[in-house]
Amino acid sequence: MVVADVPAAFSDMRASRSARPRTNEVTEAAHQRTAGAATASGTPEAVGARTAAATADEGLSFTQEAVGMESPSPRMPSVGVVIPTRGNRPEELRAAVWAVLDQHYDGRISVVIVVDGASPEIVAEQVADVIVPRDAKDALHDVRVLPNRLSPGLPGARNTGIAACDTDLIAFCDDDDEWLPGKLAAQTAALAGGAEFASCAIEVEYGTHRRPRLAGTETITKADLVRSRMVMVHSSTFIFRRGTLWVDESAPAGQNEDWDLALRAAKRRPIAYVDRPLVRVRWGGSHYVARWADRIAGLEWMLARHPELAVDPRGAARIYGQLAFHNAALGRRREAGRWALRTFAARFGEPRAPIALAVATGLIPASKVLALLHHRGHGI
């Protein structure tokens, strides 16, 4: 395999790892699929069993061999980290993989990069340089690059990755985000109390600005996620017990699949939460950022899927205000006004309604509103 050159931004990484012999062996595994493709019908968990059988470990494998090295401690749960990518952000992807492999964690880490709509071979070349074991801790860490075998888009890519894992835990990381030091250790400790699902605070990066987003709690409940989207409960913070949850691939354009997953998790059992920033989330660069119409469809999908969202006045007003804003951004003034009225009826003090009306009347562009909010680490 031809290994892509590492840009200057990663020269320090390469230098720190090149002191040891390169032991990566890149192999192509051609496994036979053991079942038919998973269908899109049924609940995510019902589809999950079929999905796991339908997505064999095909793809490119980077195994970190280490003769004579001790295996990671069996007392620590193994973690499968699913990183979806479209393959056209190599520097950010390398940084994401590096940050995962650089965790000080005594258990096995298995990274599954799922390529959605691009060449797995090219993506494998992009990450080859950052996968060099440094010590015994890295001995059994592995990285695989697989094609998305399910529905195109983010939910299908995530489920492809989940199905490819045999680990105790599943974790997500977007290809433009980075785990910060101590994430895995802190979250696995939080899960040790009996929780099935854990999250943590984030550090939002927008341009040159970074702002922490904390929740001020150690537990996230269903009521919390009904009342507020809780932006800090971000997909790149998710870690949960394998076999408990799958992503719903019916989400329109993948919109709100992460909120839906967290809400379903919280309905099962409260979410363990570490209230310090352990993931750096970059806003404004995601390939999966949706268009306004997709955002509208995603919110309407959530209201239909989780009727309780319309019961809590604060939570309902927030969603209605978002729908008013998104319609205003599309120039649908009548629809924006209708949703603004519903917002005021649910909770008169909800700020999104007047903002949406300002956009609908042309007082301020929607893009400028988002830029101002993102600059402060907030979204609409």
Where are these regions (language model features)?
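Catalytic core of nucleotide-sugar-dependent glycosyltransferases
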Residues: 277, 281-284, 289-315, 333-345
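Conserved nucleotide-sugar donor-binding catalytic segment
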Residues: 217-295
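A conserved acidic beta->alpha catalytic loop
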Residues: 115-129, 150, 174
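Glycine-rich, basic loop-to-helix element that forms the pyrophosphate-binding segment
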Residues: 147-165
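Flexible acidic/His/Gly-enriched loops in nucleotide-sugar-dependent glycosyltransferase catalytic domains
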Residues: 137-142, 184-245, 292
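Membrane-interface aromatic/basic loop that binds lipid-linked glycans or pyrophosphate carriers
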Residues: 14, 53-57, 62, 67-69, ...
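Short, acidic, metal-binding catalytic loop of nucleotide-sugar glycosyltransferases
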Residues: 98-108
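Short aromatic/hydrophobic "clamp" motif used to bind/position activated sugar donors
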Residues: 170
